[in-house]
Amino acid sequence: VSATITTPLTSALVRGALELERTAHGLLPHRLPARARAQNSDPQLALAESQPSGVRLALRTRATAVELDVLATKRVYRGAPPRPHGVYELLVDGHPAGRASADDGNTVTIDLATGATETRPGPVRTLRFTDLPDRDKDVEIWLPHNEHTELVALRTDAPVEPAPDGDRPVWLHHGSSISHGSDADGPTGTWPALAARLSGVELVNLGFGGSALLDPFTARAIRDTPADLITLKIGINIVNLDLMRRRAFGPAVHGFLDTVREGHPTTPLTVVSPLYCPMHEDTPGPGAFDMDALAEGRLAFRALGDPAEVPAGKLTLTVIREELSRIVTERSADDPHLRYLDGRELYGETDHAELPLPDGLHPDGATHRRIGTRFADVLRTTFPDGGEKTGGPAA
């Protein structure tokens, strides 16, 4: 069957992105708007927000064959084992029906020792999904959670229209590389994607690898994005970048929450503290690549801070959980829709004994499944009837 019908790629077909940039090749999904990107000078966040975690094409069609032309950008770390290609996953009526990868594209080579980067342009690739059921159906193509992807062209063997919006509530989540999906098996295997699917909500994933840092421009982006439930997972990046001390942390959390509440005054909002991570439980940052492990061809991390500096204000995960619990308790006196969740309820010490973090920092696929299953219970508690859209931000 030949996919000969070309459908223009527009925002009506894309979910989970805050903005689509028109490039020389096609559409580049962004998870932060242009105004926020203009205020950011950190290449790590620029990389993370342009990786389309949680972004998917959502179509209604009878098509049995779907082709998507993409221009992927591959990351290569000099001296480290090669990274697997990003995965595109196709779902039919919510069920997995195909996987594909772009085997080539632009390449960015990163020198971990110096931070220097080198870019090589590459070709557009065509992803083909065939033998889909010949009936009207909802088709989603989830883009790789960890690979910058430009959408170039969409072809099918039957007409396509945008999938109906439906009345599923929108869950907006913000967090670190763990929320972004680091080391998950694929884009539907990140814990936020799993939790959303299990609880029947629409995901907007603002998990940014290395970049959940209480940035005011991120708070403004959340403020201005419609959502029926907001969850903010705060802590691990602030510790492993050694970004701030206790004195700055509390006011920064208050400011972030104040900004989000300007647009969502009564939206259910849950602050989630860090998962259990032995490296930083009681040892401050910064965290760094373990060069001995790299020399053996393994990727691992270590904490470089000194626990003796905690009384002087250095942050650890233990301190951050205490602070977040205190702040949410204080604020909830005037904010009945604000809650606190200890991240160790999602992944705690006993989980770590059974499913350790392979590189000391990031969960693998099995651990993403465990966290996602547990978080689905949190979402079901918020939306016991499968939810009802309320919209927001407030006019």
Region locations from a protein language model:
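Loop/turn elements at helix/coil->beta-strand transitions in domains of secreted/extracellular proteins
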Residues: 200-202, 226-229, 264-269, 335-338
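Oxyanion-hole/transition-state-stabilizing segment in secreted/luminal serine hydrolases
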Residues: 195, 214-262, 270, 274-284, ...
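N-terminal secretory targeting modules
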Residues: 1-170, 291, 380-395
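Acidic/histidine-rich helix-loop elements
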Residues: 205-212, 240, 360-363
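Catalytic His-Asp segment of secreted/periplasmic serine-dependent ester chemistry enzymes
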Residues: 278-395
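Short hydrophobic segments within beta-strands
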Residues: 68, 174-175, 272
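A general structural detector for well-ordered alpha-helical segments in enzyme core domains, enriched
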Residues: 191, 249-256, 320-327
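Serine-esterase "nucleophile elbow" of acetyl-processing enzymes
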Residues: 132-133, 139-226
